[in-house]
Amino acid sequence: MAHKKGGGSSRNGRDSESKRLGVKAYGDQFVSAGSIIVRQRGTKVHPGLNVGRGGDDTLFAKVDGRVRFGRSRGRSVVSVVREAPA
């Protein structure tokens, strides 16, 4: 005879790893060329001046400068404004 009842198995208890999405460089922050500005799924934020978009919709700086967030045609847009070396 069984000493204990059979321990049932649970079908829950799993979760996916977080993807660490979001803004990585905020407005007025200085970034160097190639720096990631926003990690996202889809184009929640669109690339503006001096900003490129990667295959996974990541936005990155094409030049050294300061990050500027704004709106254009009803969309959120991020640009990088070149800054003269101090």
Swiss-Prot record:
Sample GO molecular function, one term: structural constituent of ribosome
Gene3D superfamilies noted in UniProt: 2.40.50.100
Record bears the keyword Hydrolase: no
Region (Disordered): 1-21
Disulfide bonds: none
Signal sequence annotation: none
HAMAP family per the UniProt record, alphabetical: Ribosomal_bL27
NCBIfam families per the UniProt record, alphabetical: L27 (TIGR00062)
Protein name per UniProt: Large ribosomal subunit protein bL27
Source organism per UniProt: Rubrobacter xylanophilus (strain DSM 9941 / JCM 11954 / NBRC 16129 / PRD-1)
